[in-house]
Amino acid sequence: MSSLVLGLHEIEKTQLSLVGGKGLHLGELSKIQGIQVPEGFCVTTVGYQKAIEQNETLQVLLDQLTMLKVEDRDQIGNISRKIRQIIMEVDIPSDVVKAVAQYLSQFGEEHAYAVRSSATAEDLPHASFAGQQDTYLNITGVDAILQHISKCWASLFTDRAVIYRMQNGFDHSQVYLSVIVQRMVFPQASGILFTADPITSNRKVLSIDAGFGLGEALVSGLVSADCFKVQDGQIIDKRIATKKMAIYGRKEGGTETQQIDSDQQKAQTLTDEQILQLARIGRQIEAHFGQPQDIEWCLARDTFYIVQSRPITTLFPIPEASDQENHVYISVGHQQMMTDPIKPLGLSFFLLTTVAPMRKAGGRLFVDVTHHLASPDSREVFLKGMGQHDQLLKDALMTIIKRRDFIKSIPNDKTAPNPSRGNADMPAQVENDPTIVSDLIESSQTSIEELKQNIQTKSGSDLFRFILEDIQELKKILFNPKSSVLIRTAMNASLWINEKMNEWLGEKNAADTLSQSVPHNITSEMGLALLDVADVIRPYPEVIDYLQHVKDDNFLDELAKFDGGSKTRDAIYDYLSKYGMRCTGEIDITRTRWSEKPTTLVPMILNNIKNFEPNVGHRKFEQGRQEALKKEQELLDRLKQLPDGEQKAKETKRAIDIIRNFSGFREYPKYGMVNRYFVYKQALLKEAEQLIEAGVIHEKEDIYYLTFEELHEVVRTHKLDYQIISTRKDEYTLYEKLSPPRVITSDGEIVTGEYKRENLPAGAIVGLPVSSGVIEGRARVILNMEDADLEDGDILVTSFTDPSWTPLFVSIKGLVTEVGGLMTHGAVIAREYGLPAVVGVENAAKLIKDGQRIRVHGTEGYIEIF
């Protein structure tokens, strides 16, 4: 068997590097019993390499291309064009020509063929590369087919293919092209079959797009397609398009576009029987490959031919269930303000820390809420809580509940909270003593200091046992009933204030102002403390100039050579000693902390120096406190004028005191958790250094791709199959490209919610109002905190914020996020800083462009773009 040209039936599963993704799948398809694949052969990558390997000019151009970035579009275009020209002019090796001629003689030279590209970086489980290289239809004759083989080779360097490889991290010099030559099928109809619904991701629904003639009309967007949906062997939906034209093959070669007769334009492309037959074929192919497929098909002489099948790479994985029942899962990341994927060690630690059972999928965590939705009472309580947190999530759950047949109902749970109790109930009777919070904080800090001391003597298996024991201590602190009551009481007090002040005084969201500058909020204090760091640096221009150019994380050691450098270093070290364990995505223990990468803080410090006068941190806090006191007095005075006013004022005063005394504590348990996480991490990284010295791992960060239990075993035995690390790194790269759903079912269906809002201005973008007020300003769309370049008065637009973003809040005048709820980080800090904010705005960072002027309506929950 020649390695230059292979028949489709000769292709083996291990030959990706020879035949590319498309060739590999066609080889597999041709072996499935009952699946019709047009006969053909593959000119392998060996033939391509043999044709170009001696061309020195081409190698120079490839080296130049490798040095470019995606932004260098003009240079990419020029170099790619030169490469294509060289490849077109290269002689095809004589043994390749001979082998091609032999196969064509075997299949019939007189027939027409499709000549199709198949790259080694194409149709892979993690990157489809669909449509990046060229396909040519209805080619007749040996010479013409050889010419089009060269064209396919050259199409490896179209601008779009080059840019796509850059975006997906593939090396141009390591991607090769094979060419598939297949007997041409002249179909009456053709199209695409998805074995999972491409809109909802439901794995039980097949979706068929169908049109007359060749499939190129659909792929190129020339015509609209009929769309058929099939579930459990039944057609559940039909949408018949007006098909005005189709592409057909010409007898003399090539293709042509033809108008469809008007009486046929609305005709159903496939009969119902054919739709169901095609669906069965799709399920058979999916079962063979073991995952949902994107299948190209055509119908000729009442026979379905399959001309391609590739994995659907955009589906979010389904959380695993232990049974075959229907399940509903909600995203933990949307509640934690962290929708990025988490590495295995991070997932492992979070699962060890939490008390709620969770499922993993796509590098994220999900909670199975099926039981909560099954009984009427627990459902009402649960949905009420979700509505306060995330209205889009609640609406998605309501969509599932309305189907009635998806979740089996169970009797009411007698232990469930009484749903009849409303928000307007007076907050539970707790001792309204601010020292309770101080005592809880002091106890947590003492425990952390003890941990830091005790862990220093631990190593090897002792360290892992010690960490497991300390996590139990962490859980006691995190889920301390006293802490939970304080936080819940403060939340209820805010809800009570908002409801009663609206009812009694017609004033919306009064609790927002009352929540400004509360004591003991470790997160908002963190933002103000960085203003104090800026105050230390501000008098020293040499230090400021140095910081503007710093890139090395060892910069703190260099500061001493400048006037004011020692003071700057000490101020930053003091800041890091209290807040250095924080970072973006901090619930993932593997994320790089500020103490590990202090340059992260530099842009924020410089922004503070640029945007603010000295001592502004204290003034901001005091201003917020005075506004809260003023609002309190105003409300109490107005209430006393009402019937039964003294009693109303008394109840309101108590609720306000609860907000002022307790609401700041809400941010503290998480601060304690990430504090401990950083201590654990530093100890584990010392173990990683030992593993590097022993040759078990290549770099410290390799341990992030092991679970806690796996890492313990590796430390104990010094044995590891490194392929596990490599595979999980590839998986993580794939997960980074996926957007996690708020709600996903056990069928894989992604159920989305929507806001039910009326009477909004034309073009308004809707979200959840979480901090009242109206502000107009320049939108700064920032997806990475390190890229922040803010001016006083800007409005921050981003996907989500967690506590690490708080230092930016001192510079902005408003907030818009894609993810969030009433009590999530951004909302809480926005209220404390007095910033109008709207969260849960779908695709905000795409709909709003950086630099646009926008108006944020924090009271009503929408944004206007000007």
From Swiss-Prot:
Name this protein carries in UniProt: Rifampicin phosphotransferase
Pfam families per the UniProt record, alphabetical: PEP-utilizers (PF00391), PPDK_N (PF01326)
KW Transferase (keyword) present: yes
Single GO MF annotation: kinase activity
Organism whose genome encodes this protein: Bacillus subtilis (strain 168)
Region span, Swivel phosphohistidine: 767-865
Key words, A-Z: Antibiotic resistance, ATP-binding, Kinase, Nucleotide-binding, Transferase
EC number, as in UniProt: 2.7.9.6
EC category: transferase
Residues covered by region (Rifampicin-binding): 326-754
Gene Ontology biological process terms in this record: response to antibiotic
Keyword Transferase appears in the UniProt entry: yes
Annotated catalytic residues: H825 (tele-phosphohistidine intermediate)
Reactions mediated catalytically: rifampicin + ATP + H2O = 21-phosphorifampicin + AMP + phosphate + 2 H(+)
Transmembrane regions listed in the UniProt entry: none
Chain's gene name: rph
Similarity comment: family membership: Belongs to the rifampicin phosphotransferase family.
Region (ATP-binding): 1-313
